[in-house]
Design a protein with these regions (language model features):
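Helix-loop element at the rim of GNAT/NAT acetyltransferase active sites that forms part
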Residues: 15-28
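Conserved GNAT acetyl-CoA-binding A-motif
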Residues: 98, 105-117
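A short beta-loop-alpha structural element at the N-terminal edge
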Residues: 1-14
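A conserved beta-turn-beta hairpin within the catalytic core of GNAT-like acetyltransferases
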Residues: 67-79, 89
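Conserved beta-strand in the GNAT
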Residues: 50, 56-65, 83
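Conserved beta-strand-loop-alpha-helix junction that forms the acyl-donor binding cleft
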Residues: 113-123, 138-142
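Conserved acetyl-CoA-binding loop-helix of GNAT-fold acetyltransferases
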Residues: 84, 90-103
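Active-site rim helix/loop that mediates acceptor-substrate recognition in acyltransferases
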Residues: 27-48
Length: 144
């Protein structure tokens, strides 16, 4: 079942799921995450979805809406932090999360939805209706 992230989801399993995306094991403490939750909770232009199976979150993805000066003040949707538990991949979980993010962006009247991904994930996103466009550049500002 896909639904919006709730404060009670941010637990040991959810944080370990995010670690699968970053590739870095880090011990997260709930109290440290509280300021982020408060900032997130009151933002109508950012939504995180989770896929819950048997009471456990096995996938997550976020959608953000950016307002632009271009295109007469319309908006662009961004999809970020897409991850499915390594034991649940290739089961439709990721595709469902992407569809939910795209719907959120449509409701936000976005004229396009964009995302960054690794070369290995291009076929997956193409299967979700995305097409390769341009390049991504990056500059890390914080180590680790």
């Amino acid at each position: 079942m896909i639904r919006e992230l709730e404060v009670t989801d941010i637990d040991e399993y959810y944080m370990k799921l995010l670690c699968q995306l970053s590739g870095k094991e880090k011990e997260y403490i709930w109290q440290d995450m509280w300021p982020f939750w408060l900032r997130y909770e009151n933002n109508d232009h950012h939504q995180t979805f989770v896929y819950e199976d048997k009471g456990r979150v096995i996938g997550t993805a976020s959608a953000l809406i950016e307002h632009k000066f271009l295109h007469y003040g319309s908006s662009v949707g961004h999809i970020e932090d897409v991850v499915v538990d390594k034991h649940s991949r290739l089961s439709g979980v990721g595709k469902g999360l992407i569809e939910e993010c795209v719907e959120f962006c449509k409701k936000g009247k976005c004229y396009k939805v964009i995302l960054d991904c690794s070369k290995e994930n291009i076929p997956f996103y193409e299967s979700c209706g995305f097409q390769y466009s341009e390049n991504c550049m990056r500059k890390d500002l914080i180590d680790g």
